[in-house]
Amino acid sequence: STSTSTSDYSAADRAELAALSKVLAQNAEAFGAEALARMFTVYAATKSYFKDYKDFTAAAPSIKAHGAKVVTALAKACDHLDDLKTHLHKLATFHGSELKVDPANFQYLSYCLEVALAVHLTEFSPETHCALDKFLTNVCHELSSRYR
């Protein structure tokens, strides 16, 4: 698909994502730091984009700060399901043109965020997982769009 359309999200997906976005916003630092720390452990090559970082654990101030930034951006993107392309354009350009991040890394971080949420949320139903996976797939697609 070339962009996210309204039809990509059912009413149930939208309800799941609206609830999840609140949880993400309230716990951005904790979930973000854990997701990044998991990514740096499981996909060690991703560390190459963070040359100034010495500590890649979830307790590191730099990991907490970047994790909070990422998860806050994802929570805000949940409010723009019908126009992710426009909403994420600046971030896509920054990551694609300036940072030149390998687009595969967006998917790696998505996997790690899903694991972190599944571990910590008591209400992480298959329906929540499905809606989140659909959303993160669309976010990854849009963030990768400035490479082409």
Curated annotation (Swiss-Prot):
Boundaries of every Globin domain copy: 8-148
Residues bearing the modification N-acetylserine: 1
Highest taxon above the source species: Eukaryota
Positions bound to O2: 66
The keyword Acetylation appears for this protein: yes
Biological processes, Gene Ontology terms: hydrogen peroxide catabolic process
Cellular component GO terms held in the UniProt record: blood microparticle; haptoglobin-hemoglobin complex; hemoglobin complex
Keywords, alphabetical: Acetylation, Heme, Iron, Metal-binding, Oxygen transport, Transport
Summary of the tissues where the protein is detected: Red blood cells.
InterPro entries: Globin, Globin-like_sf, Globin/Proto, Hemoglobin_a-typ, Hemoglobin_oxygen_transport
Gene Ontology molecular-function annotations: haptoglobin binding; heme binding; metal ion binding; organic acid binding; oxygen binding; oxygen carrier activity; peroxidase activity
Residues that hold heme b according to the record: 95
Assembly with partners or alone: Heterotetramer of two alpha chains and two beta chains.
Similarity section: Belongs to the globin family.
Record function comment: Involved in oxygen transport from the lung to the various peripheral tissues.
Protein name, as recorded: Hemoglobin subunit alpha
Gene: HBA
